[in-house]
Design a protein with these regions (language model features):
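Charged, non-catalytic interaction/linker regions at domain boundaries
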Residues: 2-207
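Amphipathic, oligomerization/interface secondary-structure segments
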Residues: 181-305
């Protein structure tokens, strides 16, 4: 976005404000779709980049010391320390606007319906989580976690010039609510807080298949199809054992029979994943099996109450 004329062009963006830090150093990160040509190195031309991730943190804590400070007395009446605010802007640099009128029409259309908002917000979150996954792998930190849009204190969709969006600013933007609507209704149907209490109270346990299928979904949504196929293989094996006869429900029995029948298919997909990237058809089958496994798990949660 430092290329000639980029400061005059207008770009759409999705922006997240998070309390605290996100784990990425402040700066601009150029990104292309996996499998495409690499993004330019520092100092090279930036023409034609697919996306830009901009991270800036207000009130960031001072860098850690080599030696820890000695423990200090903490007074109960003391005011809590203020948290830094991390602003993450996912810039849609692959689709610049011809002018202000086009950008304004795009913003109106983008924020008119819930499903359109969700698509753009998920797109921005996927770019952030792709960067977080990369830094976790590069640093060997297994506790670097993904960020969901719902965990942001504010989410915006808007547009601005190249210089504006590079600074986390905009020409026009709308605050969007990502905690309500269909996202909230899906969560309410499952009553997750009741289950949290049951798990922490020792009255219920989390099945291995739940953890593995969740990981498969995380990888799938992040575009890590090979990893998703490998997680699916072991997750499906665990699910077929753990949920066999778990419900007296015709739908459950039917779905379990389909999964049992396609068990070998999951193994084939995992073997393909070990050899390289999966083709579109293999990706479709992986997605289909993960969605079916999720449906089985979801039905069990709903019917058990």
């Amino acid at each position: 976005m430092a290329s000639s004329g980029a400061g005059d062009r207008l770009f759409g963006f999705v922006q997240f404000d998070f309390a605290g830090t996100v784990g990425l150093p402040d700066g601009r990160y150029l990104a292309r779709e996996p499998g495409g040509p690499p993004a330019p190195r520092q100092g090279e031309t930036e023409d034609g980049e697919q996306s830009v991730l901009v991270v800036s943190t207000e009130g960031a804590p001072a860098p850690g010391r080599r030696r820890r400070r000695r423990p200090r007395q903490s007074k109960p009446e003391a005011e809590p320390d203020s948290l830094p605010l991390a602003r993450v802007t996912a810039v849609r640099a692959f689709e610049p606007f011809a002018g202000g009128e086009e950008a304004a029409r795009w913003l109106d259309a983008a924020t008119e319906a819930e499903d359109t908002i969700d698509v753009l917000v998920d797109e921005g979150a996927a770019l952030l989580n792709r960067a977080l996954h990369a830094i976790a792998a590069a640093s060997g930190d297994p506790y670097m976690h993904s960020r969901s849009p719902e965990s942001a204190v504010a989410v915006r969709i808007g547009y601005g010039s190249g210089q504006q969006v590079a600074d986390g600013e905009w020409t026009d933007a709308r605050l969007v609510d990502v905690r309500g609507g269909t996202r909230r209704r899906r969560s309410d149907d499952l009553r997750p807080l009741e289950r949290v209490a049951a798990v922490l109270g020792g009255r219920e346990r989390i099945d291995t298949s739940e953890t593995l299928i969740l990981r498969a979904r995380t990888d799938l949504d992040a575009g890590r199809i090979r990893e998703a196929a490998l997680q699916l293989r072991v997750g499906l094996e665990a699910l077929l054992i753990e949920l066999s006869g778990a419900l007296n429900d015709p739908g459950h029995d039917e779905d379990m029979a389909v999964l049992q029948e396609r068990r070998g298919e999951a193994g084939e997909l995992a073997n393909l994943a070990l050899r390289g990237e999966l083709e579109a058809e293999a990706e479709r089958r992986t997605r289909e099996l993960i969605e079916l496994a999720e449906r089985v798990l979801r039905r069990r949660r709903v019917l058990r109450g």
